[in-house]
Amino acid sequence: MGMQCNTKLLLPVALIPVVIILIGTLVPILLHEQKKAFYWRLFLQSQHVEAPITVTQGDTVYLDASNNPCNYSSFWYHGNCELCGWNGYLRNVTHYYTNTSCSPQFMCINETKGLQLYNVTLNDSGAYTEHVYECDLSCNITTYNEYEILNYFDNCNYTINSTKHIITVVSSRHSKQTNSHVSTHAGWAAAVVTVIMIYVLIHFNVPATLRHKLRTRNNVNRIA
């Protein structure tokens, strides 16, 4: 009888470590899947956005990365030329790759995964598109070794978000002409408003002045 009781007690005790191991294994997986689902909904809110921008020749333009939770899956393109992206051949995988063969003068911002265009010319007008790829990466990449990260980046092949910045570069002369036109229109508007105000003042004040003169003349005649 005593042996049967001990056996019944040992079975739940033996199951406790198994339950703890299962919980320790399943909870991180469930949390990770929940986080992925949240980011997926976040990305879909701004999928395929177009943002028009007008700048003057010689300006510097900063293009921020869109909502990308860990900033490890953004790639920038100008036409068919990849400006910024991840280079699998770099030993330090936390740095952005800059493709110097592309025509605009630009710099890839490693900290924000954004793009900076400097000293823009008229030829730099066009679409600059940021593609965000789905990568099964945690926010802390130090948990992966180099080869694991490169394998993950090789599998980042599904675009879930893209932002197209349509940049129009205008010449400084055009900008000055525009400012001149704005100033001219503002001057004409001020002149018209002034004329209207003078007309209103004259219209209301002249009859009042005449009435005052007539009243004064009548008073003089009565006294006489």
UniProtKB/Swiss-Prot annotation:
Signal peptide segment: 1-25
The entry's keywords: Glycoprotein, Late protein, Membrane, Signal, Transmembrane, Transmembrane helix, Viral envelope protein, Virion
Keyword NADP set for record: no
Record's bilayer topology term: Single-pass membrane protein
GO cellular component, one term: viral envelope
Glycosylation sites: N71, N92, N99, N110, N119, N123, N140, N157, N161
Record's keyword annotation contains Transmembrane helix: yes
Localisation: Virion membrane
Matching InterPro entries: Ig-like_fold
Transmembrane annotation, as ranges: 186-206
Protein family according to the UniProt entry: Belongs to the RL11 family.
Name the record gives this protein: Glycoprotein UL1
Source species taxonomy: Viruses, Duplodnaviria, Heunggongvirae, Peploviricota, Herviviricetes
